């Protein structure tokens, strides 16, 4: 395939579950090391992300999926884990890691995104152990989940690093007891030759620990 025309600025598509402190670190590093190449970040669904990468609207993507069945190249970048968001006065704070049977007594606010498979896996595990929460609410954004948790409507599920970084929203992170529910952020690249500036951005992403 022919090389893609250089885009200024670089356009990065991020599906909602993949937003994390590492993304902020990547943007900061890009500005410090290559300020002449700005980056535009766009939050999209996985479907929009895949289509946009394949048709040339985006240069790179960050997602919690490898986009199987498509022509994109996926490489693992950062690793996180599923954790609980609890209110600042929750009895669950007595646990350093919360067992399933304990948080199953509370309404669960799950951050619903089309690529958040680890949440579905955890829900299946809870059903197998007969400890399904009394109520399950689905929301589309992390911010709404955090607001509802802080207001006492239930407890939330999300990425450990993002919950821990949102302490100012009056929510506190607690890990889940038992087997770790891993979340992996992948960098998605279109199947064509990319300009060197895109390759450099991808290298910076790979250099950030997570």
Briefly describe each language-model feature range.
Residues 22, 153, 172-210:
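A late-sequence structural motif
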Residues 4, 74-82, 86-108, 199:
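Flexible hinge/capping segments at coil-to-helix
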Residues 9-13, 61, 85, 109, ...:
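Short, well-ordered beta-strand segments
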Residues 21-23, 107-129, 195-198, 202:
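Secondary-structure junction motif
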Residues 45-50, 54-57, 63-64, 114-174:
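Hydrophobic hinge/microswitch elements
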Residues 2-51, 158, 194-199:
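N-terminal winged-helix
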Residues 25-33, 40-86, 149-151, 170-174:
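Short beta-strand-centered segments that line the small-molecule binding cleft or hinge
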Residues 12-13, 82, 98-119, 206:
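Short loop->beta-strand "edge-of-pocket" segments that line small-molecule binding or catalytic clefts
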């Amino acid at each position: 395939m022919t090389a893609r025309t250089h885009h200024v600025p670089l356009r990065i598509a991020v599906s909602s579950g993949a937003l994390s402190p590492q993304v902020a670190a990547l943007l900061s590093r890009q500005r410090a090391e290559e300020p002449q190449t700005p980056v535009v970040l766009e939050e999209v669904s996985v479907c929009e992300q895949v289509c946009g990468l394949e048709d040339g609207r985006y240069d790179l993507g960050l997602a919690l999926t490898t986009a199987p069945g498509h022509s994109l190249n996926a490489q693992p970048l950062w690793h996180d884990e599923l954790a609980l968001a609890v209110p600042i006065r929750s009895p669950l704070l007595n646990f350093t890691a919360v067992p399933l049977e304990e948080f199953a007594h509370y309404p669960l606010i799950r951050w619903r995104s089309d690529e958040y498979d680890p949440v579905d896996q955890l829900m299946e595990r809870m059903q197998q152990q007969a400890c399904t929460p009394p109520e399950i609410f689905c929301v589309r954004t992390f911010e709404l989940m955090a607001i509802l948790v802080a207001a006492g409507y239930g407890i939330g599920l999300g990425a450990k690093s993002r919950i821990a970084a949102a302490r100012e929203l009056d929510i506190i992170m607690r890990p889940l007891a038992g087997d770790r529910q891993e979340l992996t952020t992948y960098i998605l690249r279109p199947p064509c030759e990319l300009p060197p500036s895109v390759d450099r951005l991808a290298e910076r992403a790979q250099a950030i620990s997570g």
